[in-house]
Amino acid sequence: MRKFLALAATVILGGALLIAGCGNDNKQAASDGKQVLKIGATAVPHAEILEQVKPILAKDGIELKITEFTDYNTPNLALGDKEIDANFFQHVPYMEEFAKAHKLDLVSAGGVHLEPMGLYSRKIKDLKDLPKGAKIAIPNDPTNGGRALLLLQKQGLITLKDST
């Protein structure tokens, strides 16, 4: 966990330096002269990770202000509107697809961990108990929807056509 936090701090610090070098007029200085970095994140686990990174960045003179979001659209829109300096919640394919669809100029300042995808049910405890014709919800965005379809295929629940 300590290695992960150190890596997260490095990525965020790198992003902060990248943002600082971009001449963003939205940057603020804290009352004590520290640089303020406003990052948007989804609550779990991203904002939790940022809370752990906050004291590490403070040692480097960066005050981290975290804005929590409850969906995956608003952080990118807030970034596009310069309400925040960066966000921390998504993988690059999702960011690129979102930026293209919403005509935003978003770039990755560093990698993030990729959340595992799983099958969840309150009623069904084993896939062999899944009734034929059962409905399964998947994410509504192309990148994560594609990941979900591949997971369903790997579990033998669907067959996808060959992409060639």
What are these language model-derived features?
Residues 1-36:
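Short, low-complexity disordered leader/linker segments with a strong preference
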Residues 23-38, 57-58, 126-133:
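Immediate post-signal peptide segment of exported/extracytoplasmic ligand-binding proteins
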Residues 32-44, 62-68, 135-136:
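Short, well-ordered beta-strand elements
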Residues 56, 73-87, 100, 150-151:
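Short helices/loops that flank or line small-molecule/ion binding pockets
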Residues 66-77, 164:
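Short helix-initiation/N-cap motifs at beta->coil->alpha
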Residues 80-90, 134, 157:
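Alpha-to-beta junction loops
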Residues 97-109, 124:
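Ligand-binding "clamshell"
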Residues 109-159:
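A conserved helix-loop-strand patch within extracytoplasmic ligand-binding domains
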